[in-house]
Regions:
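GIY-YIG nuclease catalytic motif and its immediate N-terminal context
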Residues: 1-50, 84-93
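Aromatic/basic micro-patches that form nucleic-acid/chromatin recognition or nuclease catalytic surfaces
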Residues: 43-46, 50-107
Length: 107
């Protein structure tokens, strides 16, 4: 099995909350909590973040509002994993963070 995928979280500026689509996706957002993007990649997360910021296969919210990687939200998931595990955990992490009141975008 090929273990080179990662789940990563990006901290975004609260300015992303100006987007109605983002707000509608986060009806349980608790004001003051972080705005986050959760993704998965076959690249090193630092490289993937740099590509987002450069506009290469970028999520528009991350490109415009991404501040930094936020590994503290996935501290237990820093090791490479299979594509299938990363795909599952990307969704799982996003759901768990939303349940805790964070504003989360996961595509």
């Amino acid at each position: 099995m090929n273990f080179h995928h990662y789940v990563y979280v990006v901290l975004m500026s609260e300015e992303v909350l100006q987007h109605l689509k983002f707000l509608k996706a986060n009806p349980n957002y608790q004001k003051g909590k972080s705005c986050l993007y959760v993704g998965m990649t076959g690249l090193d997360p630092d490289t993937r973040f740099d590509k987002h910021k450069a506009g290469i296969k970028a999520n528009s919210y991350v490109q415009k509002y991404g501040l930094r990687l936020a590994p503290e939200f996935v501290a237990d998931l820093r090791q490479p994993m299979s594509y299938e595990d990363a795909r599952y955990l990307e969704v799982d992490v996003a759901i768990r963070l939303k349940e805790k009141g964070y504003a989360v975008w996961q595509a």
